[in-house]
Amino acid sequence: MSEVEIENAATIEGNTAADAPVTDAAVEKKPAAKGRKTKNVKEVKEKKTVAAAPKKRTVSSHPTYEEMIKDAIVTLKERTGSSQYAIQKFIEEKRKELPPTFRKLLLLNLKRLVASGKLVKVKASFKLPSASAKASSPKAAAEKSAPAKKKPATVAVTKAKRKVAAASKAKKTIAVKPKTAAAKKVTAKAKAKPVPRATAAATKRKAVDAKPKAKARPAKAAKTAKVTSPAKKAVAATKKVATVATKKKTPVKKVVKPKTVKSPAKRASSRVKK
């Protein structure tokens, strides 16, 4: 072999020796990287399965709320029903293993039972429905559902009745108008009649005014009384003033029969004679 061939062979062996450890290191590193990824993926999957695990449903040691409420109402035996507080107290004394939200749940169940018709609410108390009410409730529901189907016929009948009623009202109004005219004539006649009453009242007033003038003539007797008794003068004067005041106060509109009043002069003369 020549020297050139020997040198080429040596360089090839050196290159292969240098390349061998690099490839081994690369091969060793790659599996390590793959192993880390698989570990992370497994950990995430395990966490997800733990979180997604369904919670076990806790079985309550007490019966349903409906049964407990009915039992409380039956045992309490109140005539007007049992209040929420009484039912709550009874259940708490009888059942010791109750949840912390028992009172809220009791109120919700009471409302639900009242809405469904299993309980009857009277003011602030609850009681069981009577047997007659239970029997009548299905019948009432059936009756309500039956007329609901026959609504179109009833609507047509009501429309026809409304038209007939409107026509009859129009006829009545036409017939009533002549009556109103006749009534107006009658009222006008009635208003014209009371005129003679006013004339009669005027004549009575004139007669009343004329009578006192005729009675005021005997003034001579008053003069004789003045001479005999000076103390009686003041009494007669006061009486005259009183009679004048009463005459002024009498209203003109009222027609009053004249009273037979003696004049003060005559009274004085009668007292002197006594």
Curated annotation (Swiss-Prot):
Biased composition (Low complexity): 16-25, 129-145, 175-185, 221-233
DNA-binding is among the record's keywords: yes
Annotated Gene Ontology cellular component terms: nucleosome; nucleus
Glycyl lysine isopeptide (Lys-Gly) (interchain with G-Cter in ubiquitin) cross-link site: K161
Modified residues (N-acetylserine): S2
Keywords: Acetylation, Chromosome, DNA-binding, Isopeptide bond, Nucleus, Ubl conjugation
One protein family per Pfam: Linker_histone
InterPro entries: H1/H5, Histone_H1/H5_H15, WH-like_DNA-bd_sf, WH_DNA-bd_sf
Domain H15 residues, every copy: 61-130
Cysteines engaged in disulfide bonds, as pairs: none
Compartment(s): Nucleus; Chromosome
Superkingdom in the source lineage: Eukaryota
GO molecular function: DNA binding; structural constituent of chromatin
Record field: compositional bias (Basic and acidic residues): 40-49
Principal subcellular localisation of the protein: nucleus
One BP term from GO: nucleosome assembly
Region annotated Disordered, chain positions: 1-63, 129-155, 167-233, 249-274
PANTHER family tied to this protein: HISTONE H1 (PTHR11467), HISTONE H1.1 (PTHR11467:SF168)
Function: Histones H1 are necessary for the condensation of nucleosome chains into higher-order structures.
Family: Belongs to the histone H1/H5 family.
Name of the featured protein: Histone H1.1
Annotated source species: Arabidopsis thaliana (Mouse-ear cress)
